[in-house]
Amino acid sequence: MSKDVLKEQALDQNRKGTTTAHLDVAKHLAARVIMAFRCGFKVRSVSIDDFASPVDEIVCDWKNERATYANDAKLIRRAFGFVYIGTIIDQKSTDAPSAALRVQVDEDMTSAQEVREAAVEWNLVPTVADTNPLLHNGYKVASRLLREDPQLVEQLAAQLCQSRRMVQHELETWFGSHAKPLALEKLEDSSRFDW
């Protein structure tokens, strides 16, 4: 199915108010927002109503954190985690993915390619194919974070279903009042088996 057909199906479901599609997308995006905040990334907005433009569903420019991080490898690993955490949570569902969710996953794959290209551009690896170890580490951290923050993701997903759209200050306030302290470094350094 083409990306345009998937977008049209997602728009149609959105117009009909399909709550299952909204909840699936809300969980996917909530996981990404939680990962972003745990990484110290700023999230300008998140919306479950912007199916026509999946890039607007979550607006977070992780590349802007490069100066603050001063560690390109760590930033790239965390960016991979940010991109893939939604897909990890999607895999837990036994239902077939909605058209809206498939559109978001396609957009995540585009975002993953951007992370790969940044790793090459920043001279961390010689080619895009060499980014797999960085991707693997980011995926592991995202998986570990989902084990630590499952209720937080569910709570934010519920809030997104109610609010439909949240902007940066709303997200920061919500996160500050709901999230427990957690050092992402602890999860990155953990030797626990993840599969």
Give each language-model segment a name.
Residues 2-195:
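Soluble catalytic regions of large protease machineries
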